Amino acid sequence: MMKYKVIALVGKAGAGKDSLLDEVLTGNLGKYDLHEIVSYTTREPRQGEIDGFSYHFVDKYTFADMVHDGRMLEYTKFNSWMYGTALDSLSTEKTNIGVFNPAGIISLMNRPDIDLYVIYITATDKERLIRQLTREENPDVREILRRYDADEDDFYLFEQHTIRKLVHFTRIENGDHTFYDALDALEKTLDKIV
């Protein structure tokens, strides 16, 4: 059976997952030769997001067809939007890296064709809130609060139960004034995995 090597970054909203991923891919793509996993979603693009780069933006019918046809490795619903990772988003020749939520991690854990390495990015609530409020010109405060509430439930179960079942697990703190320390820790972890 063919196995896909997947490095999954996971963390609450505003923890810095995407920023760390961008730094690793842009600064060290040649060093690690990583394949970035681009997920699918049915939501509208946010300011600055590009189809095929940030996400594959598809309508709900296309997404439903992909689920029905067994092309999705994992998927989940947030509000009325669907998010997921398709099998065709993975490379068999390179180590794959992407951002996942706790439900996605659980789905990947249960797949025999995935060799999973989880890196949990954490930050204080204050730091996360500051990042989310300053990320966009006109942030949707209600959406930020909704994501905070959802994270409390999702990550409680993840922290209490899922982490114990992971074979390959690393926690990295990306708090106040520690971005480059977190990046350094991430690179050291990647050196061991890749």
What are these model-derived regions, one by one?
Residues K31-P45:
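Short beta-strand-centered segment that lines the nucleotide-binding/catalytic pocket of NTP-utilizing
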Residues L133-P139, Y156-V194:
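NTP-dependent small-molecule kinase module
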